[in-house]
């Protein structure tokens, strides 16, 4: 990737961070303007959930469970076979920074609900209770 960036005269605009510890990764998320998930194959990407939890504006390909995680008004989801939409949405984040920040805040609220340990524990216990009653 670094060679490709250099070949396209982007070497001074793209920073490859290498391996990061937990705190460094959190800071990298907080320092960025946009989180981009251009994957063509995903399930339920942890990196998207982490970006959402930190309120980072997100642009993600509509693959796997992405659209179940990132809802309208919380970020941009684009068709994975349409890279021009990826470019468009990244541009929108920079053009409409206030809107992007609001979407990041909405994504954070969604992620806080989805990843709430107490709620998840209650829901799981209820599932087990129902299963036990059916036995």
What are these regions (language model features)?
Residues 40:
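Aromatic "clamp/platform" in nucleotide-sugar-dependent glycosyltransferases that forms part
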Residues 85, 92, 99-114, 120-126:
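A short, well-ordered alpha-helix in the C-terminal region of glycosyltransferases
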Residues 57-60:
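Short hydrophobic beta-strand element within catalytic cores of glycosyltransferases
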Residues 26, 45-53, 67-68:
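Short alpha-helical segment that forms part of, or immediately flanks, the ligand-binding pocket
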Residues 72, 76-83, 92-97:
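Conserved acidic donor-binding segment of nucleotide-sugar-dependent glycosyltransferases
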Residues 19-20, 27-32:
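Short alpha-helical donor nucleotide-sugar binding micro-motif in glycosyltransferases
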């Amino acid at each position: 990737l670094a060679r490709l960036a250099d070949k396209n005269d982007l070497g001074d605009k793209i920073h490859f961070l290498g391996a990061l510890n937990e705190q460094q990764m959190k800071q990298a998320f907080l320092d960025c303007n946009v989180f981009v998930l251009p994957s063509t194959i995903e399930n339920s990407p942890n990196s998207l959930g982490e970006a959402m939890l930190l309120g980072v504006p997100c642009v993600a390909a509509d693959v796997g469970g992405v659209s179940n995680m990132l809802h309208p008004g919380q970020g941009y989801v684009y068709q994975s076979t349409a890279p021009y939409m990826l470019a468009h949405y990244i541009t929108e984040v920079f053009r409409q920074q206030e809107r992007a920040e609001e979407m990041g805040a909405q994504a954070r609220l969604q992620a806080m609900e989805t990843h709430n340990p107490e709620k998840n524990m209650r829901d799981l216990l209820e599932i087990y209770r129902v299963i036990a009653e059916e036995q």
